[in-house]
Amino acid sequence: MPHSDELDAGNVLAVENLNIAFMQDQQKIAAVRNLSFSLQRGETLAIVGESGSGKSVTALALMRLLEQAGGLVQCDKMLLQRRSREVIELSEQSAAQMRHVRGADMAMIFQEPMTSLNPVFTVGEQIAESIRLHQNASREEAMVEAKRMLDQVRIPEAQTILSRYPHQLSGGMRQRVMIAMALSCRPAVLIADEPTTALDVTIQAQILQLIKVLQKEMSMGVIFITHDMGVVAEIADRVLVMYQGEAVETGTVEQIFHAPQHPYTRALLAAVPQLGAMKGLDYPRRFPLISLEHPAKQAPPIEQKTVVDGEPVLRVRNLVTRFPLRSGLLNRVTREVHAVEKVSFDLWPGETLSLVGESGSGKSTTGRALLRLVESQGGEIIFNGQRIDTLSPGKLQALRRDIQFIFQDPYASLDPRQTIGDSIIEPLRVHGLLPGKDAAARVAWLLERVGLLPEHAWRYPHEFSGGQRQRICIARALALNPKVIIADEAVSALDVSIRGQIINLLLDLQRDFGIAYLFISHDMAVVERISHRVAVMYLGQIVEIGPRRAVFENPQHPYTRKLLAAVPVAEPSRQRPQRVLLSDDLPSNIHLRGEEVAAVSLQCVGPGHYVAQPQSEYAFMRR
C-alpha cells in the first residue's frame, strides 16, 4: 500500500518505534527498544555501539530477515522510498514482495564475505543471478553487467575474476565482490554491517573510499554499522549511538565527536585507540576501558621494563616457507607461493615483538612456521639454544609446551562438544603434567586469572561472548606455563572495549610471568600500544624492524608509511587525502618453481632500527 504522503521530503527511509525481541526459555528477551531514525537520499548514517547493542538485528529487521530466525518485530512505521519513488511500508510486504525489494531497492553488505558468498558458484554467476532476478536480463546481458560492476568497484582483470570462486580471492577482493553484488541493481538504500572490521587498514581505507564514491554516483542512502569510531569519523554524516538495545544519542558526526552528551558516547570515544598516543613513551601502556561512571578515566600506564636482557628466547634466521602450486595435464608442481622469504629476527623474554603487514605479507605463515604447523624449506628456528626445525615429532611435541598459539577466531579454536574446562585441561593431559584433581584446580585458577569464574568450566563455547571465548583460549595457552605465546590477529574482530580488556590482560600476564609475545596484527593503533619492537612484513620479507617508538615516530620504509597513513583517525575534521582508486592489492608472490627472489638487505638507521636498502625496495616503489 503506498504511503507517499507519510515520508518527509528528502528521506528514503523512516523508522518509528522499532522493537525487536527473541524467545529464550519461554521468556521474551528484548534486543531493541523504541528505536526511531530516518535516512536521507545520499546520506550516510552510522549506527555505532558494542556487540549486543542491537545494531545488526536492526539491519536484519529492516531487510525482513529476522522472522526466519525467530525474531519478534514490532514497528509503528518502517517506510522505504523505492527507486521508482513509490513509498512502501516494509512490515506489510509479503515474503514474495520482499524478495523483489531486497537487492533492487535495499541491499546489504555483511561482515564476513566468505560466509556470505556461495563457495560452489563463481563470482560472475553470483552477481549475474541478482541482475537476472531484478532486471529481467538474459544470462549474457547479466554477465556483461556483472563485469561492469566489478570494474566499478575497481577490481583489476575483472573478466578473469568473473570465472573465479570466492576462495580464490583475497579478503579485500571478496568484500569488493560483495559490494558489486549489493550495488548491481542500484538500490535506494545500502546497509553495510561491519564490512571492514577484520580487513587490513589499507584494504579498509580503499573499501571506505569506494563506498563514498559509489554513493555519490548513485545518490544512495547508506546505513553503516560499526564499532570503529575512526571509520565513523571518516564516512558518516550523522551518527546514531546504541547501548543495550536503545538509541542513547544521535546527531551530526561533528556534534557526536566534538560535543558528546551521553556518558556512553563519551566513554566510547575515550576508549578509541589513537595512533600517536604513545609518542615519547618507551614501554607498552594499558588501554582505558569503557566506564559510564568515569568515561574519561585512563587506565594506569605500565611504565616498567619487562624485557629480560641476555640471550633471546627465540632466534629465527633466514626462514623460508613456500607452498607448491600444481598445474598441467600431469598435475606437476610448476609454481610456488613464496610466503616467507629469508626472514630473521630475535625475541627476548618478557618482550612483545609485533609482526605487521597486509594480508598475504607472510605474517601468519611466519607464526605457524615457528611451531612447524607448516613446514619450512630453509632457515633456522632456535628456541632456548635448541633448533626446532630439525626436531623429531616426539621431541617437537615436548617443546610445544613452551610455545603456545592464540588464533584469531576463538570459536573455531574451541571444540563445541567439549566444556571449556575440558578444553583447558586437554593440553595438561596430552603432556601428562597434572593428575585429575590438580588439573581441575589449575583450570579454576586459570579461569580466575583471565577474568572468568571457576564455575564457567562446565559451560560450552557457544554460551560465551566473543571476548569471553578469547579469554578461554588465553587460559588454555597459559595452562602449560609457556615462555612464548604467538597471538595471530587475536583481537582483530573484537569490540573496542573487549579488545582493550584482552590487551590489558596480555600485558598483566607478561608482567607477572615474563611471557614473550609474537603479536601478529594489522591494527597499527593496537600494535603501537602493546609492542616493544615492531617488524613490518611485505611480500614475505621484513622491510623494517626496530623499537616501536622508532618505527612509529620515524618510519623509514615507504610501505611502513603507507600502513600508518591508512589508519582511520577518530576526528571528522582530519579528512584523509583522496586516493586514486586503482587496485592496491599486493603484487603477486607466486613464482616459477626454482626461481629465487633477491633477499632484502637491511641497513641500520638507528639503535636497533633496520630498514630495507633502496635497491631492495624496487617492487614497492614501482607500484
From Swiss-Prot:
Catalytic activity: glutathione(out) + ATP + H2O = glutathione(in) + ADP + phosphate + H(+)
Matches recorded under Pfam families: ABC_tran, oligo_HPY
UniProt subcellular location: Cell inner membrane
PROSITE patterns: ABC_TRANSPORTER_1 (PS00211), ABC_TRANSPORTER_2 (PS50893)
Alphabetical list of CDD domains matching this protein: ABC_NikE_OppD_transporters
Binding, ATP: 49-56, 357-364
Record's keyword terms, sorted: ATP-binding, Cell inner membrane, Cell membrane, Hydrolase, Membrane, Nucleotide-binding, Repeat, Translocase, Transport
GO CC term, one of those recorded: plasma membrane
EC number: 7.4.2.10
GO molecular function, one term: ATP hydrolysis activity
Residues of the ABC transporter domain: 15-269, 314-564
GO BP: peptide transport; transmembrane transport
Membrane topology annotation: Peripheral membrane protein
Record note on quaternary structure: The complex is composed of two ATP-binding proteins (GsiA), two transmembrane proteins (GsiC and GsiD) and a solute-binding protein (GsiB).
Function of the protein: Part of the ABC transporter complex GsiABCD involved in glutathione import. Responsible for energy coupling to the transport system.
Family stated for the protein in its record: Belongs to the ABC transporter superfamily. Glutathione importer (TC 3.A.1.5.11) family.
Protein name according to UniProt: Glutathione import ATP-binding protein GsiA
Gene source species: Shigella sonnei (strain Ss046)
Lineage of origin: Bacteria, Pseudomonadati, Pseudomonadota, Gammaproteobacteria, Enterobacterales
